[in-house]
């Protein structure tokens, strides 16, 4: 799966996980989104499913500050918008906070759910805390990757005692 990042440059560039992915050639920086890309949008009404893979040729992470996330996503982006199911952050800024993922965590989760666990590990290896994100979420990610519908995702959330999304 081809990865892209739309960097809104709202964070400290030294701590920006999207910039690091670009630096290592793991994601391409873009200035606008394409129609056949999957947009990771925490405000989307639809949850990401493995079956979404056949609809797109890339995944785009919108890199923005969590403090400005509402205004960042008021803009409309071309592409297919999906939100991730609930996951715990493994990054030092938001450790164990539900759904407060860094861009790399969001992209890694999306590619795992869509069936590319090898790419997930490649992405996370670039960060000291990458393994922490995976350890916190490995069972969830595995279950989410097997879900065939949003109702199955909601069942999984209920089984793990996670708040409804």
What positions do the PLM features span?
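Short hydrophobic beta-strand segments
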Residues: 1-11, 37-40
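Catalytic subdomain that performs nucleotidyl-dependent activation
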Residues: 107
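Acidic, serine/threonine-rich low-complexity regulatory regions at protein termini
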Residues: 9, 32-33, 162
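Long, charged alpha-helical interface segments
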Residues: 138-165
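Active-site cofactor/cluster-binding pocket
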Residues: 14-102, 113-140
């Amino acid at each position: 799966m081809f990865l892209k990042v739309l960097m809104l440059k709202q964070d400290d560039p030294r701590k920006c996980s999207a910039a690091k992915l670009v630096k290592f050639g793991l994601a391409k920086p873009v200035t606008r989104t394409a129609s056949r890309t999957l947009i990771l949008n925490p405000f989307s009404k639809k949850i990401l499913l493995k079956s979404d893979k056949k609809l797109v040729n890339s995944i785009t992470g919108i890199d923005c500050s969590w403090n400005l996330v509402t205004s960042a996503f008021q803009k409309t982006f071309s592409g297919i918008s999906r939100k991730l199911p609930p996951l715990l952050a493994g990054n030092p800024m938001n450790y164990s906070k539900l759904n407060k993922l860094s861009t790399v965590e969001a992209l890694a989760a999306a590619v795992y759910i869509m069936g590319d666990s090898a790419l997930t590990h490649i992405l996370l290896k670039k960060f000291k805390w990458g393994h922490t994100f995976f350890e916190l979420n490995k069972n969830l990610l595995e279950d989410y990757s097997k879900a065939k519908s949003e109702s199955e995702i909601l069942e999984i959330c209920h089984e793990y005692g996670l708040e409804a999304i």
